[in-house]
């Protein structure tokens, strides 16, 4: 500092700052729920820009939301990864086109089978999709009902941890009236 200058020290003590009106009003994007200056990182920049133009044009002043799509590396990260038993490409398109129905228009059947997995066993259910039953909902119901793990592993297959075949023979017709007792086949135990 030179001889004639005086330093202005602003207090960093907690409390209100002069010239600022309280409570502070925060504005968030109605599409990505981030502050507007972060809309560029949401992956929905075009939708965020349209929302801001319509609802809060004053937010666009001084902001630069880029028009460029995400880079190839970012795009690959955003793609949903298929897990075990998931279909990709032509197989997924064919399953969607057929509506999950079995080929050939054969009789509608639900099959139950116990499979050994190491020292324990799992129950495999096939054929529920032929009755227009949502497999994710059914899997969640089985997991809650039997207090065990249950997952959709294929286009028309649910795997439940544990041997619950006998309980399923009663539960399926009770929960889904379109499936009768005669349409459920117990295939027994699968050999190793």
From Swiss-Prot:
Pfam family, one: DENR_N
PROSITE patterns: SUI1 (PS50296)
Signal peptide: none
Low complexity bias spans: 87-99
InterPro entries according to UniProt: DENR/SUI1_TIF, DENR_C, DENR_eukaryotes, DENR_N, SUI1, SUI1_dom_sf
Domain SUI1: 117-176
Family affiliation: Belongs to the DENR family.
Name recorded for this polypeptide: Density-regulated protein homolog
The species this protein was found in: Caenorhabditis elegans
Lineage of the species this protein comes from: Eukaryota, Metazoa, Ecdysozoa, Nematoda, Chromadorea
């Amino acid at each position: 500092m030179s001889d004639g200058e005086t330093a202005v020290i602003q207090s960093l003590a907690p409390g209100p700052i002069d010239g600022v009106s309280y409570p502070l009003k925060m504005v968030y994007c109605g599409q990505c729920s981030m502050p507007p200056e972060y809309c560029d990182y949401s992956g929905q920049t075009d939708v965020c820009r349209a929302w801001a133009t319509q609802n809060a044009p004053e937010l666009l002043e001084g902001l630069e939301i880029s028009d460029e799509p995400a880079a190839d590396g970012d795009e690959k990260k955003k793609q949903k990864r298929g897990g075990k038993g998931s279909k990709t490409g032509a197989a997924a398109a064919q399953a969607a086109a057929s509506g999950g129905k079995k080929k050939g228009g054969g009789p509608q059947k639900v099959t139950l089978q116990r499979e050994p997995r190491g020292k324990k066993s799992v129950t495999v259910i096939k054929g529920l999709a032929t009755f227009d039953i949502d497999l994710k909902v059914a899997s969640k119901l089985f997991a809650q009902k039997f207090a065990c793990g249950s997952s959709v592993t294929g286009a028309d297959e649910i795997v439940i941890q544990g041997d619950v075949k006998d309980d399923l023979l009663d539960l399926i017709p009770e929960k889904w009236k379109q499936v009768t007792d005669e349409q459920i086949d117990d295939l027994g135990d699968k050999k190793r």
